[in-house]
Amino acid sequence: MKIGRDELVFETGFMAKQANGSVLATYGGSSVLATVCCSSNVREDLDFVPLSVEYNEKYYAAGKIPGGFIKREGKPKDKEILVSRLIDRPMRPLFDKRFGREIQVIPTTLATDQLNPPDIVGMNAAFTAVFLSDIPFNGPIAAVRMVYLNGKFIVNPSFEEIHDSDLDIVVAGSLNGITMVEGGANEVGEDILLSAIDGAHEYIKQICNAQKEFLDIVGKKEKLPLAFEEKIFEFKDELRDFVYADLKEACFVKGKLNRDKAITLLRNKSYEYFSSLEKLTDSNESLFHKAFDDFEKEIVRSSILNDNIRTDGRTPNEIRDIISEVDILSRTHGSALFTRGETQALAVTTLGTSIDEQIMDDIDGDKRLNFMLHYNFPPFSVGETGRLMTGRREIGHGHLAQRALESMVPGKNDFPYTIRVVSEVLESNGSSSMATVCAGSMSLMSAGVPVKGQVAGIAMGLISEGDKYVVLSDILGEEDHLGDMDFKVAGTKNGITGFQMDIKIENVTKDLMRDALEQARIGRIHILSIMNTVISNSRVGISKYAPKIVQLQIDIDKISLVIGSTGKTVKAITDEFEVKVQIEQNGKIILFGDDDFKMQKAKERIESIVREPKVGEIYEGTVKKINSFGAFIELTPAKEGFLSTRLKPRDSKYGSGRFGNSNRYSRFGGGGENIRGNAGLVRPPKLEEGQRIKVKIIDIDKFGKIDLEIVRDKDY
C-alpha cells in the first residue's frame, strides 16, 4: 500500500519460519524483519503481560562496520531502547494476561536507505508479525510518523524533513482510535497537534485494513489457548463488607506515605481476618489481593467521577503547590530545584567544550550532540531500596524531557558550548519527567544559556465511564496507575515543545483530546507564572567556573597557517596559553580556557598569524637565521622579514636610519655603538638565533619582501 512517498510492503513465510510469527516490512529502501515467539512454559499466577521488545539495528544495514576496537554490535544503544519502548507501549495492553507465557518481539533492521527512518518500519513489522501469529492478540494496530513543515503535514517523512519540521510525532493506533502519541515540536499550537493526530489516524486505518487482509490470506487463524480463566475471589462480597468503609477513608489520607501505610494496614488486617477463618489458601491468595486492589480502584475512580474529589483532596484541574529555587549549588555552572507536591527534581547544568560532545555512531550516520539531558531515578525517591542503575524507563523519561527543551536551546553558532543537564529525582509521586522539564529549564537559565523561553511540563490523566469523563491535571502516581489515559505536555507560553500520550481505552474522541489539551495549556501557563517569579530570563554571562570561550573568523585558505606543519603551531598556542583550540572547516576558530587574559593573548597570536603585514605595524618576532648582511626575523609562522645589520648613517632615507641613531641603540639593551673615528656610523646590537626582538615593518616591495627595523620598548 502507498503511504506517503513510498510503498509499505509486508512479506511473510520465507524468513524466520520457526517463530510464532515473522514479517519482513519494507518502506522505500529500508527493511526490518520482526519476529515474535512465546515460551512453552505456562504460569497461572501472572497478573501482568511478560512481554519484552528488543529492537536492534545492524551496521551492515547501512554498509558500515562498527567503530571502535570491537567490531560487533554490542549492548542496545539509547535509540534502540527508545524504539523498543515505542513498540512496547501500544502493543502491551492488547495481549491477554491469561495467556500466561513469556512473549518476545525482536525487530531487526536489515537495510536502510538513509532516507526513510527504520523505526516506523520496525513498529509496523512488529505489530503485523504479532497479528499474524498464533499468539492471542487484540489487533490490528499500526503506526506512522507525522511532521508539520512549511504549513503542511507530511506522513512518514525523510530524515531531512524531520530535521526541518516544526512538529515531529509518532502516532500508533487501531481502527477504532489512537493508543499512543509521542514527539517534539517547536512551540506549535494545540490545534496543529490535534490535526496531525487526526491525519495520522487515517493512514493507520489503511495499514490496519491491510493487516486484516494479510491475516485472511496467510495468517494463523487458530490461536494458542489461554492458560487459565479469569477467577474471582470467592469471598469478595464478604471482603467488601469487612473493609470497604474503612478503605474509603484510607484512600483519602493526606500524604502519599501515610496513605500507603493506612491502605497497607487495612490489607494486612483483612488478610489476617480471612486467614483466621481459613478462607485464604495458596490458590486464592493472589485473588484476595486483586479483589482488594479492585475496591481501591473503584473508590478512587468513583470519587473523581461523581464527586470531583481526588485522593489528596484536590479538584480535577487543581495543581499541587509548587516551590522553586535556583543557584542552590555554588560550584556548578547552573542549578535548580523544582518541587511540586511530593515530586521533586534537582537539575544541574554543566557547560563544556566541543570535545565533550556526544558522538553518535549509528546506521543513520554519525552525529555529534551538543545538548544532552540525563534523568536519574534513585530508589530513595520513593522510599525504597534498590540498585543504582540506568534502565529503559530512565532513558525514556530523559529523552522526553530533552525533546521538550532542545527546541529552546540555542544552536552551536549562537552558543558554542556543549550543554549537559542532569536531573536527579529526589522525590516522586507522579510526573517526575515533567518536573525534570521545569527544573531543567530553570537550570539552563541559571547557567546563562540563552534559551528562547521558559519551558514547563504537566502530566494529565483521565477517568472515564461510558460517555462521562473527567480530565485530571498534575496526576499522582496512583492516578496514573488507576486511570484510563496518561499524557504529558511540555511547552512555553507560546506553544507545545514535547508530548507523550498513552491511552488505555478505545474511542477517545477528538473533543475529549481537545478538552484535555486546553486544560493542560491552562495548567502549563500557571506553572510558568510561578517559575518566572524565580527566574524568567537567562543570566547575562556564564558561571565563573565554566570554561570561557573566544571566537574569531579567518579565511579558509589560512587554516593551514594556524595549524602549522604537523600541528606544530596550534600545539604551541595550546601549550603557551593553556587553551583548547577548535578549528572548523569554514574558518571559524573557537578558543576554550579558564583565564580571560591568556585567551585574549591566544586570540591575538592567531590574528597575527593570519594577518597580512602592513608598513608601520609592529611585531615581536623571533630571530631565525643570521648571515653577514643581516637577520631573518619570523613575524608569524608564515611570514618573515629581513633586518639588515650593515653599518648605516644616523640619518638615512628612513629618517632615523634603519637601525636608528646611536642613542636609540644605546637604549636597546646596551646595543648599538658609534664606530671609533666615524661618529656618523653606528653598529647594530648583537643578535642570536631564537632571540625575541621587537621590530617594525618599514617597507614591503612588490614581491612581498619585508624590511624591518628594531623598535625601542617605549615605541612598542
Swiss-Prot record:
Residues covered by the KH domain: 547-606
The entry's keywords: Cytoplasm, Magnesium, Metal-binding, Nucleotidyltransferase, RNA-binding, Transferase
Transmembrane parts of this sequence: none
The EC number(s) this enzyme carries: 2.7.7.8
Signal sequence annotation: none
Pfam family, one: KH_1
Residues reported to bind Mg(2+): D480, D486
Gene Ontology biological process terms in this record: mRNA catabolic process; RNA processing
GO molecular function: 3'-5'-RNA exonuclease activity; magnesium ion binding; polyribonucleotide nucleotidyltransferase activity; RNA binding
InterPro entries registered for this protein in UniProt: ExoRNase_PH_dom1, ExoRNase_PH_dom2, ExoRNase_PH_dom2_sf, KH_dom, KH_dom_type_1, KH_dom_type_1_sf, NA-bd_OB-fold, PNPase
Keyword DNA repair carried by entry: no
CDD domains, A to Z: KH-I_PNPase, RNase_PH_PNPase_1, RNase_PH_PNPase_2
Primary residence: cytoplasm
Residue ranges occupied by any S1 motif domain in the UniProt entry: 616-711
Subcellular location: Cytoplasm
Keyword Endoplasmic reticulum: no
Cofactors required: Mg(2+)
Top-rank EC class of the record's enzyme: transferase
Reactions mediated catalytically: RNA(n+1) + phosphate = RNA(n) + a ribonucleoside 5'-diphosphate
GO cellular component term, pick one: cytosol
Known role: Involved in mRNA degradation. Catalyzes the phosphorolysis of single-stranded polyribonucleotides processively in the 3'- to 5'-direction.
Protein family per UniProt: Belongs to the polyribonucleotide nucleotidyltransferase family.
Family annotation (PANTHER family): POLYRIBONUCLEOTIDE NUCLEOTIDYLTRANSFERASE, POLYRIBONUCLEOTIDE NUCLEOTIDYLTRANSFERASE 1, MITOCHONDRIAL
Family annotation (HAMAP family): PNPase
Protein name: Polyribonucleotide nucleotidyltransferase
Name of encoding gene: pnp
